[in-house]
């Protein structure tokens, strides 16, 4: 922990007092010999004292199952909420949680109940970039949900284009415009019709 504390202290020395320093941590690495929740409960106040303004709690570690860091459909919703809620009890700075928060009602509930101060969203915003606006407007049923399938987002990161030796462009199994926004501009039809979509295949 000494290295990260020194980094935080140096960052704080070199930025203004109102410049936010946000630290992302694993609430638990969930492997033998890895950082445990107990260790994070000990370290979190030290991070705060060193100058961190907000903690973002993830989980897992890359040496094991990648799907523990970026939970798939087989993992429960709110994979890291318990760890984040416990860490929140020992600090006086905002604590956000990340990791399969793919239901906006669930996200609102854990904030309203005071388990966390906020949620960080990634994949749900690929599925529906207007998610937050739709929720604010009371249009939850119009939200295109992330199903945590990994087919367009995480899987594409690890698919290498052999010509350029770079990751393939990001996409989303539920949002055909994701990563192709400049190519798939949706315009209003000249003639409006009522249509039915049969099947999802």
Over which residues does each language-model region extend?
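Flavin-dependent oxidoreductase catalytic cores
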Residues: 1-200
């Amino acid at each position: 922990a000494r290295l990260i504390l020194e980094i935080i202290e140096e960052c704080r020395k070199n930025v203004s007092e109102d410049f936010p320093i946000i630290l992302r941590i694993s609430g638990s690495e969930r492997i033998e010999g890895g950082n445990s929740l107990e260790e994070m409960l000990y370290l979190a106040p030290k991070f705060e004292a060193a100058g961190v303004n907000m903690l973002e709690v993830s989980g897992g570690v890359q040496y094991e199952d990648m799907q523990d860091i970026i939970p798939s459909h087989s993992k429960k919703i709110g994979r890291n909420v318990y760890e984040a809620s416990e860490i929140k009890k020992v600090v006086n700075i905002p604590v956000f949680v990340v990791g399969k928060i793919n239901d906006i009602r669930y996200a609102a509930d854990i904030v309203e109940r005071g388990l966390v101060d906020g949620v960080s969203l990634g994949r749900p915003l690929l599925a529906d970039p207007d998610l937050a606006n739709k929720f604010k407007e009371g249009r939850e049923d119009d939200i295109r949900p992330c199903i945590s399938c990994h087919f367009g987002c995480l899987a594409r990161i690890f698919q290498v284009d052999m010509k350029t030796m770079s990751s393939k462009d990001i996409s989303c199994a539920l949002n055909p415009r994701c990563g192709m926004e400049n190519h798939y501009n949706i315009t209003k039809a000249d003639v409006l019709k009522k249509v039915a979509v049969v099947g999802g295949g």
